[in-house]
A protein has these predicted regions:
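Conserved C-terminal RecA-like helicase domain
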Residues: 1-28, 35-58, 71, 75, ...
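Short beta-alpha junction loops
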Residues: 10, 33-34, 63-65, 107-109, ...
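Short glycine-/polar-rich loops that comprise or flank the Walker A/P-loop
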Residues: 55-56, 98-100, 282-292, 319-324
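Hydrophobic/aromatic beta-strand patches that form the interior of the parallel beta-sheet core
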Residues: 58-60, 101-103, 120-124, 293-295, ...
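Conserved helicase ATPase motor motifs in RecA-like P-loop NTPase domains
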Residues: 63-70, 80-117
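A short helix-turn-beta junction within AAA+ P-loop NTPase domains corresponding to the substrate/partner-engaging
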Residues: 115-133, 287, 293
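C-terminal helicase lobe and adjacent C-terminal extensions/tails of nucleic-acid helicase motors
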Residues: 152-156, 160-162, 179-198, 317-386
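Conserved SF2 helicase motif VI
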Residues: 282, 292-321
């Protein structure tokens, strides 16, 4: 990173930086994957190019498995807006004589590797303090009744009370499913009724509606309200349930506020947002509140990439000395572990092929069979495996 300038696309001093850019050979611009920020980035790139002729651009998409990678770039009518913008970005910059390379970063790159055959694949190094899948303690669970979940929560609170920790309960149904289903709101309400028995300091629900939180002790509730009022954060309250718009607060800061209110063990209930690339860790520098336990009840047909992404919320480098525990069915755990073993075989084969992915490479590997689809059915990955 010598002679490299790293900034965000929203940096208010960007123009003045460009005017005095003689000392920089490389610019790194960080942005969100949405059409507005992609357009802003294109404008910044052109501004730099006009000042100092750019030789090349590298677009790096994190969570690359969810980025649309259409084969036919001339027909993007039915593609997401961000994808259209990236195609437009690539074409316009190429027309100006700038070389463009695209890199997709993903822990679950199946739809990239199986279908799109990238020209080169890098296996990124894993930090020594990384807590991986092999460090997760599996506890078979088939009874997801309120009584059984309450007992598990009480046990986890006893085990985590000194060290602290966050419990994630990834449920089968979304917030808007039938009221008789075991959906997020029903699970949330059931656990609130048993909050005293669990010993949890706080119960939260995290989804597209925002963040809901209930505290066991009045003292912690008062501290939290005082905290968010001091920060001028908007909230509503209904029957002791505090509601915060997730657009007003990032999840790491929210957990940081809970930690500041002396919350040691916290439960978060959710579904889709837990299955994505979000780190459930507070923003505290020292001993951050970290997801260390997961109770997982996915649907019977949920694909293995989603299983891996959800259970992956327990992995990482935060609080690496704390034990991790997973409560789920034997079917889920076996598919998860088989999926990871298959990944190892694929990466090994690609490495032996000079890090290139040939058309027949995947189909030539003897992969272990799973009882669930590899990825979304619309991708039809299984046909590329046989």
């Amino acid at each position: 990173f010598k002679n490299c300038f790293i900034t965000t696309v929203d940096n208010k001093n960007f123009d003045s930086i460009v005017e005095n850019m003689e000392e920089y050979n490389t610019f790194v611009i960080c942005l969100l994957d949405n059409k507005t920020q992609i357009q802003k980035t294109y404008e910044k790139i052109i501004s730099i190019h006009e000042q100092k002729q750019l030789g090349s651009i590298c677009i790096i998409n994190d969570e690359g498995d969810v980025v649309t990678k259409a084969r036919n770039i001339t027909d993007v009518a039915n593609q997401p807006e961000s994808h259209k913008k990236w195609i437009e970005f690539t074409q316009k910059t190429s027309d100006r004589g700038i070389s463009v390379k695209r890199v997709f970063v993903s822990a679950t790159p199946e739809n990239v590797v199986y279908i799109h055959k990238p020209g080169y694949l890098w296996d990124l190094p894993i930090p020594l303090n990384y807590v991986g899948h092999d460090k997760i303690n599996f506890n078979e669970l088939n009874d997801f009744s309120t009584g059984q979940i309450t007992r598990i929560l009480a046990r986890e609170v006893r085990l985590r009370k000194q060290e602290g920790g966050m419990i994630l309960y990834c449920v089968e149904r979304n917030k808007d499913s039938d009221e008789n289903d075991n959906n997020q709101m029903k699970v949330f309400n059931d656990i609130i009724l048993n909050l005293k028995q669990t010993g949890l300091d706080a119960v939260t629900m995290y989804n597209s509606d925002g963040i809901k939180v209930v505290f066991r002790l009045k003292k912690q509730k008062t501290m939290f309200i005082n905290k968010i009022e001091t920060l001028d954060l908007k909230y509503t309250m209904d029957n002791n349930i505090i509601n915060v718009n997730k657009k007003d607060i990032v999840i790491s800061k929210f957990y940081g506020y809970l930690q500041s209110c002396d919350c040691k063990v916290v439960l978060t209930i959710g579904k889709d947002l837990i299955s994505r690339g979000i780190s459930f860790v507070s923003d505290h520098k020292e001993n951050p509140l970290t997801a260390t336990t997961m109770i997982y009840k996915p649907g019977n047909q949920l694909h293995c990439v989603a299983l891996c992404q959800a259970i992956g919320r327990l992995t990482g480098t935060a609080q690496s000395k704390l034990s991790r525990r997973l409560y789920t069915t034997d079917d889920v755990y076996n598919n998860y572990m088989t999926f990871i073993e298959n990944q190892k075989e694929i990466i090994k084969a690609i490495k032996e092929n000079v890090n290139k992915v040939d058309d027949s490479l995947i189909s030539d590997i003897a992969l272990w069979k799973m009882s669930r689809p590899v990825d979304r059915k619309t991708l039809k990955l299984e046909k590329d495996m046989v």
